[in-house]
Amino acid sequence: MGEHWALGPEAGSSLLLCSALLAVGCALGLRLGRGRSAVERWVLAWLCYDSLVHFVLEGAFVYLSIVGNVADSQGLIASLWKEYGKADTRWLYSDPTVVSLEILTVVLDGLLALVLIYAIVKEKYYRHFVQIVLCVCELYGCWMTFFPEWLVGSPSLNTSSWLYLWVYLVFFNGLWVLIPGLLLWQSWVELKKRDSQEANLAKKHK
């Protein structure tokens, strides 16, 4: 029982690195969102963290997977992916589906997150269009990462440990389902409100 609940040094350092990126992302987002509503400030905090994860962590994963593989690599970020690879071995040996999705995620989702940050800060008219596209891309990425694996019986997934199942697989991946889902809802509500305002304005001018 104690062994299943043990948190080793590799797991500790990986979680510490993720926490550091979260702290930096929140600090950047809250600073960029000064003078805005609490909701918008936390949206910016998430987007800053999101872009850091895409470029720093996933960007490094793509590089390591193209020049070799994570299992044979050294360094802090390689150690993080080795730790995650204990829960999903596809990340250790350059699984072509995972690497293909991650290339798309780094390039497209990372850039969209930066464009969305700019659109929010500068109050651009295309903000919610970009937000919807980014959220759909991230939800698609989660779907294509896990559903093909589940359809063949999840041979690469290790759910024997609470850490691997609930923290690595469910929590960390679930964030990119829950928050994009909430942001899609935010865009829906905002676009619906704008449409109602335009309809009311048109009625007044008739």
Swiss-Prot record:
GO CC terms: endoplasmic reticulum membrane
Limits of the EXPERA domain: 39-184
One example GO MF annotation: cholestenol delta-isomerase activity
Biological-process GO terms, alphabetical: sterol metabolic process
Annotated membrane topology: Multi-pass membrane protein
Transmembrane regions: 10-30, 42-62, 101-121, 165-185
InterPro entries, alphabetized: EBP, EXPERA
Protein localization: Endoplasmic reticulum membrane
Keywords: Endoplasmic reticulum, Membrane, Transmembrane, Transmembrane helix
Primary localization: endoplasmic reticulum
Function field: Does not possess sterol isomerase activity and does not bind sigma ligands.
Record text on subunit structure and interactions: Homodimer.
Similarity remark: Belongs to the EBP family.
Protein name: Emopamil-binding protein-like
Organism: Mus musculus (Mouse)
Underlying gene: Ebpl
